[in-house]
């Protein structure tokens, strides 16, 4: 009986669509059904390679369905408005859901309890102190050097609640749409293409998923990397220095991202002088922070890279050496 009902429904839909006979409607239904079926399949079986294959198929069908539609021209203001709406929706969706999880007491002490306590100490003393991180009063910077957190402090002064941190984190990620838009326009992409890139940005699972582990300094990385890339592309000294310093302030290992970006602009000869500046600043910052954390803090947690530290030295420079000398092993790991 179920099969008979299924066949009758298919026949009825086919007859209705035959009378409508709209070319775009066919493609809309094809794209929608493929996306729904593909998403349901990934939910049922979320193995990595199966998910990649399903995404490729859904992407190919989407390109086939909307390829001709991308030829229409959008003006600047509607494009900016659409991107702004995407950013607001991302902030509300991610910020509110993570806030609801916190308000339902689903937030763990590690790491959200640590950061909530740290911001309360920063509000009262301007020092990033915690007592629950290592069973005693100490500066969080002894564990991870992340002065970038002070950018959130003014908002925490006004609204002293952990919810402020979660909403602020979502807004920070959404702010990456601004440099993404500027980079796309610099490369003379169409407004329709810019919107698609922006849509990919907000729908990329890693953008929102990390927020559901609550607050973390790494959420600053993406927008700051994009801002630094844009500053280097524009060949501006002051913005390049400012965004380099902001990126370095995210964490003790953030110089790796800045150094790689600087190295890219050197090797590609797109901006050798400023790429060299970013690279040198990153190396100096990394050495300085690593030294002070080893001497006055709890070290740089290099044990996380033990699979790359082949000589047992515990040095992160060995990691860099291993990556250069054995790139195949790097890909394997």
Listing of model-derived features with the role each one plays in the protein:
Residues 146, 150-153, 158-178, 198:
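Loop-to-helix entry region of an early transmembrane alpha helix in multi-pass inner-membrane enzymes
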Residues 257-284:
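Perimembrane helix-loop-helix junctions
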Residues 47-52, 168-174, 196-232, 246-258:
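Multi-pass, polyprenyl lipid-linked donor-dependent membrane glycosyltransferases
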Residues 188, 217-220, 225-239, 266-270:
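Membrane-interface transmembrane helices that cradle and orient dolichyl/undecaprenyl
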Residues 3-97, 271-278:
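Start-transfer (signal-anchor) and selected internal transmembrane alpha helices
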Residues 11-20, 163-188, 227:
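Transmembrane-helix motifs of polytopic, lipid-linked glycan transferases
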Residues 96-97, 114-138, 147:
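Extracytosolic helix-loop segments that constitute the early lumenal/periplasmic catalytic or substrate-binding loops
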Residues 24-31, 174-203, 222-223, 239-242:
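Transmembrane-helix signature of polytopic, membrane-embedded enzymes
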């Amino acid at each position: 009986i179920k099969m008979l009902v299924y066949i009758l429904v298919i026949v009825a839909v086919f007859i209705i669509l035959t009378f409508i006979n709209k070319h775009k409607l066919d493609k809309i239904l094809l794209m929608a059904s493929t996306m729904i079926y593909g998403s349901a399949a990934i939910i049922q079986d979320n193995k990595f390679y199966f998910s990649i294959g399903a995404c490729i198929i859904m992407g190919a069908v989407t390109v086939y369905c909307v390829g001709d539609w991308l030829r229409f021209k959008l003006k600047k203001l509607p494009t900016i408005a659409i991107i702004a709406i995407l950013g607001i929706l991302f902030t509300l969706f991610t910020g509110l859901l993570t806030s609801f999880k916190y308000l339902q007491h689903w937030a763990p002490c590690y790491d959200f309890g640590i950061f909530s306590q740290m911001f309360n100490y920063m509000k009262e003393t301007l020092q990033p102190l915690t007592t629950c991180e290592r069973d005693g009063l100490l500066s969080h910077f002894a564990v991870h050097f992340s002065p970038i957190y002070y950018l959130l402090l003014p908002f925490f002064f006004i609204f002293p609640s952990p919810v402020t941190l979660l909403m602020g984190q979502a807004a920070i990620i959404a702010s990456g749409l601004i440099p993404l838009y500027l980079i796309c326009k610099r490369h003379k992409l169409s407004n329709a293409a810019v919107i698609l890139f922006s849509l990919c940005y907000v729908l990329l699972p890693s953008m929102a998923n990390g927020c559901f582990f609550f607050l973390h300094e790494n959420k600053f990385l993406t927008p700051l990397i994009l801002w630094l890339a844009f500053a280097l592309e524009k060949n501006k000294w002051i913005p390049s220095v400012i965004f380099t310093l902001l990126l370095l302030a995210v964490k003790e290992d953030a110089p790796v991202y800045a150094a790689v970006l600087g190295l890219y602009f050197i090797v590609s000869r797109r901006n050798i002088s400023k790429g060299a500046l970013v690279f040198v600043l990153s190396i100096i910052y990394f050495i300085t922070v690593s030294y002070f954390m080893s001497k006055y803090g709890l070290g740089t947690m290099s044990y996380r890279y033990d699979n790359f530290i082949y000589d047992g030295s515990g040095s992160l420079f060995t990691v860099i050496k291993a990556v250069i000398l054995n790139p195949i092993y790097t890909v394997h790991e």
